[in-house]
Amino acid sequence: MPELPEVEVTRRGLLPHVVGRRIAAVTVRHRGLRWPVDPGLEACLAHRLVRRIERRGKYLLLECISADAAQPPGWLLVHLGMTGTLRVLPEAPPPGMHDHFDLLLDAGPAPGMLADTIVLRFRDPRRFGAILWTTLPEAELASHPLLSTLGIEPFDPAFDGAWLHRHTRGRSAAIKTVLLSGAIVVGVGNIYASESLFRAGIRPTTAAGRLSRARCDRLAQAVRDTLAQAIERGGSTLRDFVGSDGASGYFQLDCFVYDRAGLPCRVCATPVRQIVQGQRSTFYCPKCQH
């Protein structure tokens, strides 16, 4: 499943090719995604300009503005689900059975575009992704039902050990489970939770509320470092994920513990252990993490 690093890699890959372009045509082939695609989406998007691409948690937010001042700006919310990708294509090749959505983008008023038209194509074999439209003002966007429950961004300066310590008090759930929930901090998926906890030296089964301030300091830093490294490496490709240019990610090659059950810890050579938490595989070193 694409997590924060994969979504951020996608966002950064789209920026130079998509921002400033005008939506010339919209093609929706399959509306039955995680939530049905709005039947009026084509009309909402037609002839709008893509002004910005932001990210909130695992959602991509494309701000689309109209030349008609009477039309408010809107936001196209895209979630990649478990197997989704957004690709920039120089032309529109014949769609495959899992290619559900295309935006044909022309150069619009933006100078210096390398191609007159490109296609932004959404592919999702399992159809757990989502494409939604909202005209909520930017100041109210955080109140959208899909965004309102999300925790703080891990790269927000406010996210630090003090924040983590304060928001884990009284929580008896395991710290890995708390990280995965996204309620305190967003984007720490299964791979990145295991890796962050290893770097912080914290056993994933430790009750979140028992972490000292010092351990929360280490964990907050480990979360930021792990996610930053994953973004730099293009994310993790375990099965389906590719970036907007079709390139695979390579962070999985750097993992200390994830998917290394029985192999020697890269630090102390103790065999890595695997357990199940909340129906998800967890990997840790019994010597380095306590």
Swiss-Prot record:
Job of this protein: Involved in base excision repair of DNA damaged by oxidation or by mutagenic agents. Acts as a DNA glycosylase that recognizes and removes damaged bases. Has a preference for oxidized purines, such as 7,8-dihydro-8-oxoguanine (8-oxoG). Has AP (apurinic/apyrimidinic) lyase activity and introduces nicks in the DNA strand. Cleaves the DNA backbone by beta-delta elimination to generate a single-strand break at the site of the removed base with both 3'- and 5'-phosphates.
Reactions catalysed, as given in the entry: Hydrolysis of DNA containing ring-opened 7-methylguanine residues, releasing 2,6-diamino-4-hydroxy-5-(N-methyl)formamidopyrimidine; 2'-deoxyribonucleotide-(2'-deoxyribose 5'-phosphate)-2'-deoxyribonucleotide-DNA = a 3'-end 2'-deoxyribonucleotide-(2,3-dehydro-2,3-deoxyribose 5'-phosphate)-DNA + a 5'-end 5'-phospho-2'-deoxyribonucleoside-DNA + H(+)
Protein name: Formamidopyrimidine-DNA glycosylase
InterPro entries given in the database record: DNA_glyclase/AP_lyase_DNA-bd, DNA_glyclase_Znf_dom_DNA_BS, Formamido-pyr_DNA_Glyclase, FPG_cat, MutM-like_N-ter, Ribosomal_uS13-like_H2TH, Znf_DNA_glyclase/AP_lyase, Znf_FPG/IleRS
Database matches in PROSITE patterns: FPG_CAT, ZF_FPG_1, ZF_FPG_2
The species this protein was found in: Cupriavidus taiwanensis (strain DSM 17343 / BCRC 17206 / CCUG 44338 / CIP 107171 / LMG 19424 / R1)
Sites where the protein binds DNA: 98, 126, 171
Active site: 2-3, 58, 280
Annotated transmembrane regions: none
Family: Belongs to the FPG family.
SUPFAM superfamilies given in the database record: Glucocorticoid receptor-like (DNA-binding domain), N-terminal domain of MutM-like DNA repair proteins, S13-like H2TH domain
